Amino acid sequence: MSGNTIKVVPVIMAGGAGTRLWPLSREEKPKQFHDLSGEGTLLEQTIKRLLPLHPESCVIVTARSYEEASYAELGRIGIKGTVLSEPRPRNTAAAVLYAAAYLSRIYTDSIMVVLPADHHIRKPDEFADVLRLAVAEALKGNLATIGVKPLYPETGCGYIKASPGTGEAFPVDSFVEKPDLATARRYLEEGSYYWNSGIYAWKTSVILDRFARYLPRHHDAFTPLFALDNADIASSTGKAWEIKRAVFDAVESISIDYGIMEKTDGRMVVPGDFGWGDLGSWNSIDDILPADAEGNRSPSGQRAIFVGARDCSVFAEDKRIAVVGLSNVVVVQSGGDILVMEKDASQRVREVVDIVRSLDSGGRS
């Protein structure tokens, strides 16, 4: 976009450690910097699917330890961008406010398109169309969120209930927490509930106004950042870094949904069906991998061998893995660590991570 047209700036949340995908995803190299499907890293794919918006640049909010890797991703794609390093994780409200503070120094106003770096989108063209609709809502001064049309009764994500309306965007009635199975089935039947994708679009000026209204402690705590110049607000060294550490120490860990979106007016949901998946567990990775005739899966190019196996998945960083006579099992190899797990137990990987941390720090299991 050029001239006096308001700029659209993607803001990508890329700070999570993704420990539920251990041992491949670790604090030193989390999932957003891995190629899980043979199509590029998750962060790379996220940036590329935003290119139809023709952004002049983008912002990546991440941890200081991932700053270099984030700039490397931008360089490979050939798009200008700024990496904002958080001194410590404080959830999505602080990350959004940090990006808004930075953008308010660069532009008179801008449209922030906020999204996580760990999603998979099977229909990028349809996704781009939905993003354009969300940007159009943001230009009206609304806070737009993208809802995914549910395909089945999902209990692992939150939902957005839409109010009746006409057109391609609807007022938000409410945000609802992860339901039980019976409730999820009812949501699917009613047709007015959408999966909460965690993707948003709004004017920088509008979201700053909402922070002042609904999260004034966050807004006040970030005041020193608004006084920094453009270079210092993005710096991860020196006095500016110490200022940012004090700012992040002063705010609670609050999500943008809980802190603002559940309370504010002007909320619009833009529904879409674009093959969305939240890659938060090993079970969810199955959705992005090709399967053989027996339902066994492995990223293209990996040397997995399946003999008499059914519905098994293998992710091998640099070893040949053979699975014989097993079913419904995930095998993951990364470095010197191997995970062997029934698919139904994917939520227990966090327990393994806790034990590994204890062992690595000299504790006992």
Model regions and ranges:
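Fold-independent oxyanion-binding glycine-rich loops
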Residues: 15, 63-64, 87, 115-117, ...
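A short acidic, often aromatic-flanked loop/helix-cap motif at beta-alpha or helix-coil junctions
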Residues: 89-94, 152-154, 181-183, 276-277
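Conserved core of the sugar-phosphate nucleotidyltransferase
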Residues: 124-248, 268, 343
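Conserved N-terminal catalytic core of the sugar/cofactor nucleotidyltransferase
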Residues: 1-12, 19-30, 35-116, 120-126, ...
